[in-house]
Amino acid sequence: ALHRKFNSPKDKLIFDVGHQCYTHKLLTGRFDDFDTIRKDGGLSGFLRPEESEHDIFVSGHSSTSISAALGIAQSNAILGKTDYTVAIIGDGALTGGLSFEGLNNAGKTKTRLIVVLNDNKMSISKNVGALPRHLAVIRSHPSYFNLKTKVEKALGYIPLVGKPMTEVIRRVKKGIKNLFYNSTIFEDMGFAYMGPVDGHDVETLEDCFEVAKRMKRPALIHICTVKGKGYSFAEKSPADFHGVSSGMDINTGECDPSGKSFSGTFGKKLCELANNNQKICAVTAAMTDGTGLSEFSKQFPERFFDVGIAEQHALTFASGLAKGGHIPVVALYSAFLQRGFDQLVHDIAAQNLKIILCVDRAGIVGEDGEMHHGLFDVAFLSTLPNAVIYSPKNFAELESDLETAVNGQNRLYVIRYPRGGESIPAENVPRDFECFCGKDKSTLAVSFGRVGENVLEAARELDICGLSFNKIKPIPEDAENFCLDFDKIYFFEEGVENGGFCQNLLSRLCQKGFKGDAVITAPEDFVAHGSTARLLSCLCLDKQSIINTVTGKTQHKISGQRVKSNEKSGADESKTDKTDIGESKNEKSNIKKNNTCEIGIEKSKAEISGINEGKTEINDAENGDAEKAALE
């Protein structure tokens, strides 16, 4: 209906997040490639302007469509264009405060802006009975609009009483509508409100869009849809089918069990701790299942708070809980946490409140892609005074970190962990860092979190030294001192380099007189979608790539580049092109950046990048007792 009534891309269709855009992609030239969606080198599951001229605005984080659409509409008005701009937003995304900021601003304009509210839960307003549905159909039809316009014009010609009569009719009509459903919130903001209407009735939708195009002010069309319409399993369990794996059986609706995960381990451990501590509360932002808090919500409903898509509110709300004497545990995805930085500074860190921030989906997340990878949290969280940051590489470290935070002092604790499960179960007692000391005492490989495990495995195979951090702020001083005497240190980070852990650690080492060489492997740009294993390999963060980097056999370009859609998949070996990125205070230090080997990804139009985590324990090779003693 949208594509029949609007002329895309001249008229701009702005979809909020990406879950609504699949049909849009099928209708705009990507039908033949649709089986590649969310796969390595295939179509993105979200809107990507570089993928199609019909994808106007990047999508991924919710609640942005109205503000973006209003900006485009205002730009059109300045340029004298008559194009239409349409924002399509779901009722879930409308819980985000940014949506209402956009609505509040848009209602004051006379722009050609149309907002389509896709309500698949009836959570905005419920109509009651047949009459309101009948009224909605009538007032959404072009003939109604034509008649309404003619009557208003005719009344306007009547001297003295014409305009007052028009206003009386409007008030009566508004009063009748309010008897049946609450649409005044949008009309009070200045929108012409239409609906609710059946979102599965194409003819009615086309009528609504035609009417909205004739409005002299912004219009909001409220449509009601059934999530998963046409697929019985999805209709019965819509929450379970919000996102499914490629291993789903379409005939039964069953998915392959994902196994034990960091999220599940976090949720289980938090329930255990909450049983013994009545002060513990859990807060999330519309991600109860994703963050592993479903069981907590059932066991402790009075201490569980899902605040909707409102990360800023979640953090300030948690600070209020902390002021009241509770221990709030806030579980958010890394990519969405970016929205709450001011709250972290102003409402939490500045007051030194005890809040435990559990950052899920830290690092590469796989098929969700560019806007969902958690590549920035270490960089911005490291700037917060007094914060303690952990990045566990396995479940045992996660459980230990969570227990330490619950029993810790008043301050912000951050525990960040990746999507999915652990690669290798813990063999040693969790601690702040883990070290392997090989025969080669001149070379050290360093990382943290998930990639820290890869570093340790690579170090064992190469018989060099490896250091994996669990506690990344403040950096353990004995681990720092251990790094000082190496001739060469290779740093690997599953996140942005600037402001990241590896850069912070290297800076501290240089201040302490480090005289060796340093090579940093970290992304410089955004990362495309694809399998986690492939992306980590492309970013030179898997075990084999770490081995190749240290030995100089093969190195991957890690700066990240936008790749044309006709480029073929595969990593090509090429010449080494290390670039000096600066000298430390000690002039003998030679700090290099690993920046070699281009990577082509078939049909990918986004960039490659990555972020890392790690932890450390002591496993001694021959003659390693001295190093162990030094660390202890």
What are these regions (language model features)?
Residues 247-249, 254-258, 366-368, 387-388, ...:
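Peripheral docking tails and interdomain loops at the edges
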Residues 6-7, 11-14, 225-337, 343-353, ...:
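Non-catalytic terminal/interface segments that mediate subunit docking, oligomerization
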Residues 1-109, 279-280, 284-285, 293-294, ...:
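Cofactor-binding active-site loop characterized by glycine-rich and histidine/acidic residues
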Residues 306-307, 460, 464-483:
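Generic long, charged, amphipathic alpha-helical segments
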Residues 207-210, 242, 261-276, 292-298, ...:
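Glycine-/acidic-rich phosphate or pyrophosphate-binding loops and their flanking alpha/beta elements
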Residues 165-233, 354-359, 378-428, 488, ...:
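Structural signature of the thiamine diphosphate
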Residues 121-266:
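Long, well-ordered, tryptophan-enriched scaffold segments
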Residues 33-43, 108-122, 143, 349-361:
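A glycine-rich helix N-cap at a beta->alpha junction
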